[in-house]
């Protein structure tokens, strides 16, 4: 969130209207999405694979047959059941749906907005944890990672003791650093939060590309929630996230969910994807192999320092991130310059793992820039 006023280039809000809009909202910059037409788009951690033609046609028929004149019905129950099977939801746990993970994060902030509540998360991390907390009027505390992007155990435990957060977010893997944190440290944080009376949200947005999941530990804790999305599964355009955890806890969060928050189109597309999860598993395997190839190429590249990745992105440090970003853009490749997001990310670019030919173009372009 920014401290300077932004109206996205339009005329200023009239004073008679401005007094009805929160000042902190007026001081924000809207979330900026880079124009991507004509570029190799490797800036948003999307799955670059499109559905095979036969599956596209089948999905089109399914969506075309929907009664879009009706509100969503029992198909959302079927989707919850299908996701529970897909995820391996443990006994004693429940699952709720969100219009993407962003909505789930907002619902968590809303449900946990008790007087004096604090949200805690490691930094650098996903920007929506802080943005959602502040928009809901909650205090946000960020705890810096170590220089190699690991959880700082001592700092995290001290922050939990001092601030007693209502919500603690742990991304597994983390965005934008792409790494999986040490499980022993995570469990120490989870135990500390239990001792001081808050909730922990494990964010597994990048689970299809990771070597480990928290799902088997979920049933061991009555204060831990696990959040996932179908965006990295291959459905970023569908906007569907889901939250799992102890039944009683999920039931409370679900009370603040708007009715019909998942459209019939989103629901049917997600069910279709789960029916063909073997195709999406194949795509994820290709991306994991391409990630390894990209990492090898970056390690061999003069001036590039890549960091380990368990996601569909690679964080790399270069001598001049701004120059490299602009150079890639001039060569038709769009990545994310994250160097301004946090001091630990100085001169870092976040590269999404793309199709083989896209990765080839990005590797060649970056090699030319750094040579």
From Swiss-Prot:
Pathway: Amino-acid biosynthesis; L-histidine biosynthesis; L-histidine from 5-phospho-alpha-D-ribose 1-diphosphate: step 7/9. It catalyses: L-histidinol phosphate + 2-oxoglutarate = 3-(imidazol-4-yl)-2-oxopropyl phosphate + L-glutamate. Disulfide bonds: none annotated. The modification N6-(pyridoxal phosphate)lysine is found at residue 232. Keywords: Amino-acid biosynthesis, Aminotransferase, Histidine biosynthesis, Pyridoxal phosphate, Transferase. Its EC number is 2.6.1.9. Gene3D superfamilies: Aspartate Aminotransferase, domain 1, Type I PLP-dependent aspartate aminotransferase-like (Major domain). InterPro entries: Aminotransferase_I/II_large, HisP_aminotrans, PyrdxlP-dep_Trfase, PyrdxlP-dep_Trfase_major, PyrdxlP-dep_Trfase_small. GO terms for biological process: L-histidine biosynthetic process. Its cofactor is pyridoxal 5'-phosphate. The keyword Ligase does not apply. One of its GO terms (molecular function) is pyridoxal phosphate binding. HAMAP family: HisC_aminotrans_2 (MF_01023). Homodimer. Belongs to the class-II pyridoxal-phosphate-dependent aminotransferase family. Histidinol-phosphate aminotransferase subfamily. This is Histidinol-phosphate aminotransferase. It comes from Methylibium petroleiphilum (strain ATCC BAA-1232 / LMG 22953 / PM1). The lineage of its organism: Bacteria, Pseudomonadati, Pseudomonadota, Betaproteobacteria, Burkholderiales.
């Amino acid at each position: 969130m920014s401290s300077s006023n932004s109206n996205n280039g339009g005329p200023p809000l009239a004073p008679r209207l401005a007094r009805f809009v929160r000042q902190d909202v007026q001081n924000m910059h809207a979330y900026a999405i880079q124009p991507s037409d004509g570029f190799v788009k490797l800036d948003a951690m999307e799955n670059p694979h499109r559905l095979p033609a036969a599956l596209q046609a089948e999905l089109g028929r399914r969506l075309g047959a929907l009664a879009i004149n009706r509100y969503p019905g029992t198909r959302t129950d079927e989707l919850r059941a299908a996701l529970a099977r897909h995820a391996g939801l443990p006994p004693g746990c429940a699952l709720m749906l969100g219009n993407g993970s962003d909505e789930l994060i907002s619902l968590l902030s809303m449900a946990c907005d008790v007087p004096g509540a604090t949200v805690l998360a490691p930094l650098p991390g996903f920007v929506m944890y802080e943005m959602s907390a502040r928009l809901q009027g909650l205090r946000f505390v960020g705890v810096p990672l170590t220089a190699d992007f690991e959880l700082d155990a001592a700092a995290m435990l001290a922050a939990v003791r001092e601030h007693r957060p209502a919500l603690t977010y742990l991304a597994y893997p983390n965005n934008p650093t792409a790494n999986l944190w040490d499980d022993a440290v995570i469990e120490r944080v989870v135990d500390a939060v239990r001792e001081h009376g808050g909730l922990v949200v494990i964010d597994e947005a990048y689970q299809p590309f990771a070597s480990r999941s928290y799902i088997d530990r979920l049933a061991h804790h009555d204060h831990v929630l696990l959040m996932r999305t179908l965006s990295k599964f291959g459905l970023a355009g569908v906007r569907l996230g889901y939250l799992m955890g102890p039944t009683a806890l999920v039931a409370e969060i679900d009370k603040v969910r708007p009715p019909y928050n998942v459209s019939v189109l989103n629901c049917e597309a997600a069910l279709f994807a789960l029916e063909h999860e073997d195709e999406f598993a194949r795509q994820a395997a290709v991306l994991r192999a391409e990630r390894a190839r990209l990492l090898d190429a970056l390690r061999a590249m003069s001036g590039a320092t890549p960091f380990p990745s368990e996601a569909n992105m690679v964080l790399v440090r270069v001598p001049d991130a701004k120059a490299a970003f602009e150079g890639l853009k001039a060569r038709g490749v769009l990545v994310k310059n994250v160097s301004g997001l946090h001091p630990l990310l100085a001169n870092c670019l976040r590269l999404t793992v793309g199709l083989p030919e896209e990765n080839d173009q990005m590797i060649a372009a970056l090699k030319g820039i750094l040579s």
